[in-house]
Amino acid sequence: MMAHNKNDLTNINTKTTAPTTTTTEQQPEQQQQQPEQQQQEKQNNNNNNNNNNNNNNNINNNENNENNNNDIINNKINLLDELVAAAELKGRYTQIQLEELKSKLDRTSSALNVDQDTIKLAWCLLENMQLVSVDTSEQFQKQIVACSLFICGNKKFSSLLYNLNQPSSSSFQPDNNSKIKGRKIRKTNNSKNKNNDSNEEEEETTTDTEEEEEEDTLLNENNNSINKNSSNNNELLVSIRSCINESGGDSQFLQNSVFLSQLLKHFEGEIKLSQFFDTLRSFISNLRLGNAFEEQGRQLEQSFNTLNNLYRKYEQIFFTLFHPTENYILKTTQQHNYNNNSNNNNNNNNNNNNNNNNNRTNEDYLLSIGWLIFLFCKNKLFTKDSPDFVQSLHLLLCIINFIYVNTSISELKKIPQGVQIIDTATGDILLYLAKSIPCNLDDLSNVNQNIFSTYSNLLINNSILKLFDNNNNNNNNNNNNNNNSDGIKSIFNNSSIIKDNYNSLNKSYELYYYANGDIDERLFYSFDHDIYVLNNNNNNQNNNNNNNNHNNNYYNNNNNNNNNNNNNNHLNYQYSSLLPPSTPTTPSRYGSSSSSGGGGGGNLRKNIYGTPSKSLSAGNLGSVIPQTPISLTLTLESWLKVEIQNYRDPNPSLNLINILKSADQPQQTSEVDKMIERVSSLTNNTDSLFSIGGIDDHQQQQQQQQEVKQRRKNMAIQLYYCLLEKLIKFEQNTSSNINVLLNHEDFHKSLLSNSFEIIAYVYKMEGLYFPHFINVFKLHPFSYLRLIDLVLKVDADLPKLLAQHFSQIEEKILEKYVWSNNSTVFSTIKSHDFQNIFNSNGVGAAITTHLRPTQVFSTPTKNQNNNPFRNQQLINTNIPNTPTKKNPFIQNFIKKVSTLIIAKCRKLIHAMGLSSDYVVQIYQVMIKILIDETLLFKNREIDVLLICSIYAICKVNSKNITFKAIIDKSCISAKVYKEVYIGNDENNNNNNNNNNNNNNNNNNNNNNINNNNNNNENNNNNNNPVKGDIILFYNKIFLTKMDPYIHEVFSKYQQQQQHQYQQPLQNLPPPLLNQNSPKKWNPLFHTPTKNQNNNPYNSNNNTPNKFSSSIPLSPQKGVNYNSSFSVNSMVTISPMKQHTPISSSYTYIVAKSPSKELFQINQCLNKKKNDEMVPPPPTTPSSINNNNNNNNNNNNNNNNNNNNNSNDNNNNNNNNNNNNNNNNSNNNSNNNNNTEKKMVGKRLLFDYEESPSTPSSSSSPTILNNNKKNNNNNKSENVDDPGNNSPSSSPLSSSSSSSSSSSSGGRKRLKS
C-alpha cells in the first residue's frame, strides 16, 4: 500500500515516523510515476466487474449495494479526475525522527530525576501522536517532550490516563460499522495478539469471503488514512494500559513526579508559559484522549490567567499604600534588559529571589507575605475548580487591609495626599479599598468577617504566622480580630519577625505545591524570567511562535508606575477572552441610539463598552469606563445587583404577582403557586453548581461556603423573576393572552438556564458556562436558542459584554449543538416552506428581530405574507407544496444559519485569496444542503460541510486546491475534521439506494427489498456512531449526495456570467447624435434613454422594452428628451439645453467610457480657444451626386444589416452597423441639402488612434453646433473630396480628421 496516497491525512498532519521509514519512502515515488492510463484501466476493470456482480448476484443484495457505492465513487474519480478529496502535496513533508525525540526525552528525564514508569508512558504518547503543525525545529521538539512529561508526571493528568485503563473507558471506541476499517484494525491487532472486547466486535462485523477482501482498491486507499488513525488510537490505548499495568497499578498516579515550573526551568528560558499552554492544547487535541484532558488543560490555563490579573491588581494597590522598592522599580523599568543568562542549574523549586534575600527590603517581604497568605486561603477555599474571580479579589483586599493595619513600622506606609485611609469607626481601610476598586463595601466586609478571619485564625493557630519573636512565649492568639491588640500589631513590627513569617509561609506553600501544585504561583512576585517573561534574545525562536504574540505579550509582566498604563499593558490576551468576537447572526441593538419595545426602551446613553448608564443611577455605576478584566467584572456585578434590587427574596415581586393573578383561570391552580412550585422543583439540583470546596474538619467554614452558594442561587432565581416580568410586560403590549408563555415548560427552563448563565458569567465561573445549565435542566439547545433573541431585545439594560456572550452562545448553537442526533430541527425544517426567505440572488433576507415571545414559543401559524415575488427563485430547492403552516421563529432560524454561512464563506474565501465569484456558488450549495439535504448536518458541524463545499466548487472551477490549505485557513480544531460522523442515517441511506437503483435498472426490485434491512443497521449505528476524517466523509457521503447539484450550480453560474457580458443588440439604442456630447459609437455600458418604439434595431416595435435595472451611477449630460422619451430623472444632473429637434439623440457615459476617449475630450477642450478650424464650403453638385451614388449602392446593405442587428446579438455586426449609421447620416445630409449647409459650423478635431479591435472609432458621428455666424463665414472655404472612400483615409493612419459628410472610410483635415 502506498505510504502517501492521494487522500492520506499525512497531507494534513505531520506524523512522527521511525528512522527506518526513510528507506521505504522511495516506493511511493516509483508508484506515482506509473502512467495514468494503467490506473484508469484498472479502475474501469473494477467498475465492469462490479457491474457484472450486480447483474448476476441478485441474492447478495447487501454486497451489491456496497459495490454500487464503490462504482459511483470510482466513476466520479475517473470522470472528474480531481473531485475526490485528495490533499495533494507538491513536496514531501519534513518528518520528525523518533531518535531525536527519544534523546531529548532521556536528557530531560535524567535532569529532572523522573521515574522510569513516567518515562515509558511519556514515550508511549510521543510514539502515537499526530501533529497539526509542520514545525520540526529543536524548539518545537522540546515543547512536545515537555508536554508529554507533564501529562504523565502530573497527578491530575496521570489519574485521567489511569481511568483509560478501566474496561468501561469509552475514550477510544473503534468503528464497528465500517467493514473496511474493521478488517484493517483486525489485522493490526492480530499481528500483536491483542484480543480485546472491541476487537471481537470488529471481527463480528467482517466476513472471510474473498469478495470482501477484493473490494475496490481506490476506496481502500481513500480510507487508508482513517484506518491508520483508528489503528493508531487503539495502539495508543493498548500501550497506555500496558504501561500502567507494568507500573503496578494506580499507586504511581497518586503523586506528582514532574512539576511544571521545574520542567520549564530546565530548558533555561527556551519555553515560556504562553508557548507551553499553546502546545499543550494542541498536543491533547491530537492525541484524542477525550474531553476530560482538554477540560483539565483549560482549567490550568484559566487558573493562571486569573491569578495573573489578580496579582497585577494586588501589586498596584499595595504600592499605593507602601513605598515602592528598588526591586519593583527595576522590574517595571528594566525588565527588557534583564540578563537571562543567570545560573538556573539548581533544580529546587524555590524562587529566584531566594538567592537575593539579603537585598530584599521590608516592603518586598510584606508584598510576598500578602501573596502567600492569599495562596493559602485560595488553596483552602477553592479545592475543585479554578479560583472564583470576585471572591478572590475580595480576599486580596482583606489581606491588604490586614497587612496595613498590623504593620507598626510607620516608615513603610505611604499615605495618599488628601485621603482619609483609616476609618475611625472600624479602624480598618476597607472603605478606602472599596472606593478605589470600586466594589461593594457590604460584600467586602462580609468576606472579611466570615471568610478571611477564619483562615487568618487558622494561620496563627498553626504557628504559620507568628505574633512576635520566638523568645517571647506569650500565647495570646485568641482575639486576633481585635486590631487594637498588641499581639496582632506585633506580627509585622520589626524586620526579623517579617522575615520569619515570610519563611514560614514559604515552607507551607512548598508543602502544598509538591503535593498538589501545577504551577509555582510564587513566580508572580519573584518574576522568574526563565518562565514568566518571553526571552527576546533567543535566536532559536521559531517563526511558528510568532502567531501567539498576543499571548506572549499578555504573559509579560510590563508594569508601569502610571496606573492607567499598568491597566492597559495586559489587556491584549485576557480582554479578548472577555470580549468574544461579534457574531453575524443576531443584529446588535447597540449600533443604534434608540431602542424600541418594552423592558425600558428609550434612548440610553452608553459608554464605549455598551454598558447602560441611565438605569444605573445609584453611584452612577454605568459611567465607570472598564479598562481591565477586574473592573469589567465589578461593573457587571454592580449591574446585576441593581437589576435584582427589587427582589429581596427568591420570590416574585408584587408587580409580577399582580400580573400573574390577571392570567388566572377559574377552577385552576393559581399561576403564582404554579410558578413558585415549578422554580423550586427545577432548581433542587442546583445547590452544588457553585461548589467552591472547603475544609472538611471545620463546620464553620462549610456553613459559610454554603451561604455563598445559596446566595448565588437566590440571585439567579431573582434574575429569573426579573426577566420573566419584562417578557410578560413586553408581550402584554401586543397581546393580552400570556397563558401561552406561562404554560410552556421549555420557556421556563430556558429562562432559568439564561439566569444561571448570567450569574456564572458575572463571577467568571467558566466551568459552568454553556452548555452546562441546559444539561442540568435537560433542555435541548434548539429550545434554548429561542430565548436568546428575546432576552437581547427585551432587556434594554443588558450590558454589552453579556450581549456578546449570548451572541457567542448563539453562534455555537448554530454551528454545532442544534444539529445533534436528537434535535427536532430536522423534522421542523422538513415541514416548513422557505421559498420566500431568499431573494433572487439566493441571499437570505434580513433577520427579523420583531418576534414576540408567543411567536417564538408557540405552534406554527398560517403564513400571512403575500409576497408577489415568492415564486421567483434562483436556487432550485425542490420544496414540496404540502406544508401550509409556518413558524416565524423557524424562518428567522434559517436566515440566521444562512447569514452565518455567508459570513464564514466570505471570510474563508478572502483568507485563501480566491475570487468572490466562488462565494455565490458555495453559498448556493450550502443553502441546498440546508433546505433539501438537511440530514447532512446531522451530528456534524457547519465548518465540515463548508470545507467540503469549498473544495468541490474549486475543483469544478479548475482551481487547484487541497483540503490542507482550506483547513489551515479555517483555523478549526483538529477534532472537527478528524472526528466527522460517517454513518448514513435512514433518509440518506434510502436516497443512496435509490441512486444505486437508477444506475442499475436490472436490480431495482432487489435493492428496494433490502432497504428495510439497511435501515435497521443504521438504527444500530446511531448508538455507536462511526467517525472518520473529513476526506472519508467527502468521498463516501458528501459527493454521493451533492455531486449532481454542484455541477448544476457551476453550469448555471457560467450561463449567467455569459448572459451578463453578452448584451443583446435589440436592447442597445441606435447611434444617435447629440449637440453636447462627444462622438462615440456603441457605448460599452448603456442606459436606455429612448423609446424602443422608434428604435429601428428593435424587431418588435409594438412592445417597448422596460428600462434596465442596472442604471449607471455616472452623470449623463445633454440627453434629448421628447414627449416619447421616458427616463429616470435622477440620472440627469444638469439642465437640458434647447436645440433643434432631430430624429435621434445620444448619451455619453463619462465614468464608464474608455480612458483614451476622455483624454481626447480634454485635448479638444484645451484646443478650443486657440485652435479653431474653418468649416468646409458648401458642397458642389458633383460631390452631392457622388454621395448619392454611394448611398444608393448601400441601401440594400442598410436594410439587411438592420434586420441582422435586430435579430442577432453578435459582435461581428459592428462593421455593418457602422456602415449603416454612416449611410443613414449621409442620406439625411443629401435629402436636406439646404438645411444641412446652414447647420454645419465649426468642428472639434478628435485624435482617434484606437486599436483595430475597436471599430467604433472609425466611424464616430460628428457633433453639430448651431452657430449662424460661423455658417456664414464657412461659405468661402474649400475642402478636399469628402467622398473618397479609399483605405488610406482611415483614421488609423491619420492624426486628425473632420468632414461635413464623410463615409465609412474616414475624414480628412480641414484647410483654410
Curated annotation (Swiss-Prot):
Keywords: Cell cycle, Chromatin regulator, Coiled coil, DNA-binding, Nucleus, Repressor, Transcription, Transcription regulation. It is found in: Nucleus. Residues 198-218 have a biased composition (Acidic residues). Its main location: nucleus. Residues 180-189 have a biased composition (Basic residues). Gene3D superfamilies: 1.10.472.140, Cyclin-like. Pfam families: DUF3452, RB_A, RB_B. Residues 10-67, 219-231, 337-359, 536-595, 1185-1234, 1251-1275, 1286-1305 have a biased composition (Low complexity). Induction: In the growth phase, expression is correlated with several factors that lead to preference for the spore pathway. During multicellular development, expression increases 200-fold in differentiating spores. GO terms for biological process: cell differentiation; cell fate commitment; chromatin organization; G protein-coupled chemorepellent receptor signaling pathway; negative regulation of asexual reproduction; negative regulation of cell cycle; negative regulation of G1/S transition of mitotic cell cycle; negative regulation of transcription by RNA polymerase II. Disruption phenotype: In shaking culture, leads to a higher density, a faster dying after reaching stationary density, and, after starvation, a lower spore viability. However, shows abnormal slow proliferation on bacterial lawns. Also leads to hypersensitivity to the stalk morphogen DIF. Residues 1-67, 168-231, 336-359, 536-611, 987-1023, 1168-1236, 1249-1312 are annotated as: Disordered. Key regulator of entry into cell division. Directly involved in heterochromatin formation by maintaining overall chromatin structure and, in particular, that of constitutive heterochromatin by stabilizing histone methylation. Controls histone H4 'Lys-20' trimethylation. Probably acts as a transcription repressor by recruiting chromatin-modifying enzymes to promoters. Plays a dual role, regulating cell-cycle progression and transcriptional events leading to terminal differentiation. In the absence of a G1 phase, functions in late G2 controlling the expression of both S-phase and mitotic genes. PANTHER family: RE32990P-RELATED, RETINOBLASTOMA-ASSOCIATED PROTEIN RB -RELATED. This is Retinoblastoma-like protein A. It comes from Dictyostelium discoideum (Social amoeba). The gene is rblA.
